[in-house]
Each structure stands twice: as structure tokens, then as C-alpha cells.
């Protein structure tokens, strides 16, 4: 541990001189270079439906595996009618077809999809990045990238390990890189996923630049009886994120860190003042008086959304993250953290008005930050056709019954602790899981096919969305740490990182917060409340069958788990996960 920290300090000293020199050339940027967000009129751009790519072939009516070639390109994108075109990094089958977000990949249960992800990015990044947080740093320049299919259950070599990065033309590759083509088995439960960059220390800037896209796994035999809305018009992914812009249209990211003598550029959270849906700022969508299905993905770096409709219309939740619920849940609002997915049906026939705004009222940072304003409190507008029509879609009483969260089946209990460290000025410097940097030897070694209880102890003031690669989990309970003696417990944990020795049972006796009804299904991300212990039941096997994985989950480079606030993930809030047999 000591030697790891020493190596980090040496590297920091070496790169600090370079970073500070670069900062001198950028820190003179004036506020008047920023685009005045109030000048952008809302609801003037139509909601795009992103291009579709199909991860399967149909030959004489028989569905067969397919291979896709998807590139990452430097291009320009119009986020708003009145905003100059923005330099971005975008996924697509060619530069001219690249989009932000990238194309939606449609796949079929049980049919393999092979994707060769190709890096066509330039030598230099379009955004500032911080060399002191140990990012992937190629010797010959270029922008490291690697794609992670978020929510996917597949072999480690196709998981998009942060150290499996590569530069343009595969000229340079990271220490964990193994192959050019990734294999997605598509043998898990049907549901929603998304793909995004996952390069070490660069995830936050690569996603800000535009490297995100939706991925849908369909199982027609299972899903058809539900009679949910189908077809491109009525079944739409909505990828939502926030950005700020300069007057020239370029993405604005603060180039000065909150602790510039430690991290010249890194800041604990990025928040933009413009809300983007499918690549357009506050778009509009003309809808008919009938049911629509929206697969909503929060692709923000750090912003939580608490969605609601301005006229009180209901959400009917049918899925959470990559799995269906056991039955639909009706709700007036939905809290979605970065990287979470919610699958909803909205019945516009029941709308009392001709127009309705999808709005947001989540403070930022969540939960105790600033309240929303006029700009980030609105997401998009729906304009409803006044003519009624026959709607054959239904809301089924039941969906898919997966196994319950039976804690008695767990083979062991692990304690996972979240820490934030601050400077003398009380500004965050870095965040750790279990008090360990990412490079420290693996400590979580679940056995394939088993279930574990994880007691996640959040000792910070932020809500951290915990994402576990490969595993699926159910949230069992959320218990507040007692305020009396909390500082004593934090001090003990900071020194020892041993929940049992620090008498967790003595402090985890506060108020219990019920798990929201639409979040009681199987998830791969969940919001860890500050000052709470959240018990989750993690399953390292399929939930829809007792069959074993069709791949070897013990291969290198293994998997990871981490906070999905990207600015935290990039600054050490990630740990390796090694599955054993």
C-alpha cells in the first residue's frame, strides 16, 4: 500500500510541472466566453430518433449472429438551432454517420453480437484532462478509448476494462488490452443497456465529448405477450445529459481544479446548464393520444434527475436498469442517478392538457446541493395530438418474476466503504472504496454462481451510484448511521477500514428508508445514501435461468465495481473484482 502511494506521488510530481504550464495558457478564459444559456429558446428542436444498428442477421427467416464495425470519430454536432456546431467525439459506422449519442444497437436474446470498436480520434483531446489522476497515457500521443457495455453479462475480455484501452489504429494499447473485436453473448435477461467509454482516468472527458449510446436486448417470446408499445415511433430510448457551451459552440469544462496545487484540473463534479435529450437541447416531440414507451438513460457525469410531468401525468415503470420488474409500478416522479436506466410507459391519452413538460427538481450535487433553475429544471416538451385513436397496447398486470432477494442464500457478507478525502481548505482531493486505490491488490473475489450480501457504508456527504460489472443485485434495506458517535465511527473506519472492529452494529441502528417500489427489482446501479448503510444482495449468475455463464468469468482482466459519478470514478473511486470458481 505504501509503495503504491509513493509511486503515485512520484508520478504526480513529474506531471504537475506539465499540467501547471498547460493551465497558464487556459486559466485566462473569461466568463464572457461562455454562451448565455438564457438566449437559447427551449423546445424549438425536434427530438431525434438515433440511427439503429442490428447486432444480428436474418437469413431466410433464421436469426444469426452479426459483426458490426463501429468507429469513434472527431466531428461536429448541432445541439441547438441557435448554437454553433459543437466539436464532439461520436460513435458511428462512418464519420458522416456518427451521432451524439451514438446509434442504438438492437440485439436478440441468444444471438451473439460481435463489435469491432475502432478509434479514429485525433492526437489531442477537445477537452482539458488532468494528468495527476493517473489516466491512461500513451507514449506516442493519441486519445485512449475502450468501450464498456453497461449492464452486459459477458466475458472479462469484452467488458471494457479501464486498462484495456487503445489509441487510433490500435497503435498503442493498455496493459489489459487483449483483442480488437468484443463478443456480446446476449444470453442474459431482456432489457436495456448502454455503451460508453471506460478509459482509465478519461471516462469523464470522453463521455462529455459524446461517446455514449443505447443498447437493447429483446426476447420476443417473453416480451410479446406484454403488448407494450412497439416500433420506432412508440418505443424510444431517451439518453439525457447536461452540458455547458462557449459562444463558439464548443463544450465548456472548467480547466482549473478546486485544489490546483494537487490536481490542476480535476473537480469533484461536472454540471452543465443545458439539458440534452438524444443530442438536442430541450427538444420537443409530437405525440398521439396513446401509450408510448421510453427507455430513459441518465448519461450525465454527475447530475441526478428527479423527473416529473408538469401536468401530473403518471409514469408506469416496467423496468429498472437492465431487467423487467415483476409488475408495473405507477409513480408521479422518478429519481435517476448517473448511469441508471428506467423503462417507462406514458399514456398521453390521459393527459389533461395539449402540452406537457418533462421536468426535473433534483438538487445538484445530490442530495444537498443547489436547487434547480429555469434551465436545468426542464428537460423536454411533448405536444399531444388532440384526436383520439384506438390503442391496442396494454399495461399487463404482471411482467417477469425473477428470484426474490433471499439473504439466507448468501455465501458471505462483505463490507464496502466509501470515503472522501479533503485538503486543508476542505476541498475534495480524491475518493476511495475500502480505503484502497484502484491499483491495490484485489480484495473482492466472489465465486461464480453464488450470491453475496454487500453492506455498503457511505461515509461521505454525497449520494454515490454504485455500479457492479457482471453482477446483478437487489436492494434489501437502507439504514441511517446514528448521528451520535458518527464522527468516532468515521475516524475508526478511516484508520482501520474494518466495519466489524469499528462496531458497525453499534452505529447502523438509525432510521430505515424504504426502497422505492419501482427500484425493488434486479439492478446494476443503485444510489448509496450519504450517512447510510445500504444492504444489497449481489448475484454472480443469471437471474432468468440456473444455467452457468457460457464463458469463463475468471479470465483476466476481470471486472470492476465503482461509483458512477464519473468525476469520482476517474479519481480512484473504483476497485477490481475478480471472480473465482
Swiss-Prot record:
This is Multicopper oxidase LPR1. Keywords: Copper, Endoplasmic reticulum, Glycoprotein, Membrane, Metal-binding, Oxidoreductase, Signal. One of its GO terms (molecular function) is oxidoreductase activity, acting on diphenols and related substances as donors, oxygen as acceptor. It is found in: Endoplasmic reticulum membrane. Multicopper oxidase that may be involved in copper homeostasis and oxidative stress response, and that is necessary for root growth inhibition by low phosphate conditions. Functions together with LPR2 and PDR2 in a common pathway that adjusts root meristem activity to phosphate availability. Oxidizes the substrate 2,2'-azinobis-(3-ethylbenzthiazoline-6-sulphonate) in vitro. The keyword Signal applies. Cu cation 3 binds at residues 198, 469, 562. It holds the Pfam family Cu-oxidase_2. The gene is LPR1. One of its GO terms (cellular component) is endoplasmic reticulum. Its cofactor is Cu cation. Its EC number is 1.-.-.-. It comes from the Eukaryota. Cu cation 4 binds at residues 464, 563, 568, 573. GO terms for biological process: cellular response to phosphate starvation; meristem maintenance. Its main location: endoplasmic reticulum. Glycans are attached at residues 254, 298, 386, 458, 546. Disruption phenotype: No visible phenotype under normal growth conditions, but mutant plants have reduced inhibition of primary root growth in low inorganic phosphate conditions. Cu cation 2 binds at residues 150, 196, 564.
Amino acid at each position: 500500500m505504501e509503495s503504491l502511494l509513493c509511486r503515485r506521488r512520484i508520478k504526480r510530481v513529474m506531471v504537475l510541472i506539465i499540467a501547471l504550464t498547460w493551465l497558464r495558457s487556459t486559466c485566462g478564459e473569461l466568463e464572457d466566453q461562455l454562451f448565455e444559456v438564457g438566449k437559447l429558446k427551449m423546445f424549438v428542436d425536434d427530438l431525434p430518433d438515433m440511427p439503429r444498428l442490428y447486432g444480428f442477421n436474418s437469413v431466410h427467416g433464421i436469426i444469426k449472429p452479426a459483426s458490426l464495425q463501429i468507429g469513434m470519430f472527431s466531428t461536429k454536432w448541432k445541439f441547438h438551432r441557435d448554437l454553433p456546431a459543437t466539436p464532439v467525439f461520436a460513435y458511428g459506422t462512418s464519420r458522416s454517420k456518427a451521432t451524439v449519442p451514438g446509434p442504438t444497437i438492437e440485439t436478440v436474446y441468444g444471438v451473439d453480437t460481435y463489435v469491432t470498436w475502432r478509434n479514429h480520434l485525433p492526437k489531442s483531446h477537445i477537452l482539458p484532462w488532468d494528468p495527476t489522476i493517473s489516466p491512461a497515457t500513451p507514449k506516442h500521443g493519441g486519445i485512449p478509448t475502450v468501450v464498456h457495455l453497461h449492464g452486459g453479462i459477458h466475458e472479462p475480455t469484452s467488458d471494457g476494462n479501464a486498462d484495456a484501452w487503445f489509441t487510433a489504429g490500435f497503435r498503442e494499447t493498455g496493459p489489459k488490452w487483449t483483442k480488437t473485436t468484443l463478443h456480446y453473448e446476449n444470453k442474459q435477461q431482456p432489457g436495456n443497456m448502454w455503451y460508453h467509454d471506460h478509459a482509465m482516468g478519461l471516462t469523464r472527458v470522453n463521455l462529455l465529448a459524446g461517446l455514449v449510446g443505447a443498447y437493447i436486448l429483446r426476447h420476443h417470446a417473453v416480451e410479446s405477450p406484454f403488448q407494450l408499445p412497439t416500433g420506432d415511433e412508440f418505443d424510444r430510448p431517451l439518453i439525457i445529459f447536461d452540458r455547458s457551451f462557449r459562444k463558439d459552440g464548443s463544450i465548456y469544462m472548467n480547466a482549473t481544479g478546486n485544489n490546483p496545487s494537487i490536481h490542476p484540473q480535476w473537480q469533484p463534479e461536472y454540471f452543465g446548464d443545458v439539458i440534452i435529450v438524444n443530442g438536442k437541447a430541450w427538444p420537443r416531440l409530437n405525440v398521439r393520444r396513446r401509450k408510448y414507451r421510453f427507455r430513459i438513460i441518465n448519461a450525465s457525469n454527475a447530475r441526478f434527475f428527479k423527473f416529473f410531468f408538469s401536468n401530473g401525468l403518471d409514469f408506469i415503470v416496467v423496468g429498472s436498469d437492465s431487467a423487467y420488474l415483476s409488475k408495473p409500478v405507477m409513480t408521479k416522479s422518478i429519481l435517476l442517478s448517473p448511469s441508471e436506466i428506467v423503462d417507462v410507459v406514458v399514456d398521453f391519452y390521459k393527459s389533461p392538457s395539449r402540452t406537457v413538460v418533462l421536468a426535473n427538481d433534483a438538487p445538484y450535487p445530490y442530495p444537498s446541493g443547489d436547487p434547480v433553475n429555469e434551465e436545468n429544471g426542464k428537460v423536454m416538451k411533448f405536444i399531444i395530438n388532440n384526436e383520439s385513436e384506438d390503442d391496442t397496447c396494454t399495461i399487463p398486470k404482471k411482467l417477469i418474476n425473477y428470484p426474490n432477494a433471499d439473504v439466507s442464500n448468501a455465501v458471505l457478507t462483505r463490507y464496502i466503504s466509501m470515503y472522501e478525502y479533503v485538503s486543508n481548505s476542505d476541498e475534495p482531493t480524491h475518493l476511495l472504496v475500502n480505503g484502497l486505490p484502484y491499483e491495490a491488490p484485489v480484495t473482492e473475489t466472489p465465486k461464480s454462481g453464488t450470491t453475496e450480501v454487500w453492506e455498503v457504508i457511505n461515509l461521505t456527504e454525497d449520494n454515490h451510484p454504485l455500479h457492479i460489472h457482471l453482477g446483478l443485485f437487489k436492494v434489501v434495506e437502507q439504514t441511517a448511521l446514528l448521528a451520535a458517535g458518527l464522527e468516532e465511527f468515521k475516524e475508526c473506519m478511516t484508520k482501520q477500514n474494518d466495519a466489524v472492529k469499528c462496531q458497525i452494529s453499534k452505529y447502523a441502528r438509525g432510521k430505515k428508508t424504504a426502497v422505492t417500489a419501482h427500484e425493488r427489482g434486479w439492478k446494476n446501479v443503485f444510489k448509496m445514501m450519504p450517512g447510510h448503510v445500504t444492504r444489497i444482495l449481489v448475484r454472480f449468475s443469471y437471474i432468468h435461468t440456473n444455467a452457468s455463464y457460457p464463458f469463463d468469468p475468471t479470465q483476466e482482466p476481470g471486472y470492476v465495481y465503482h461509483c458512477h459519478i464519473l468525476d469520482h470514478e476517474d479519481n480512484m473511486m473504483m476497485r477490481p473484482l475478480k471472480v473465482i470458481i
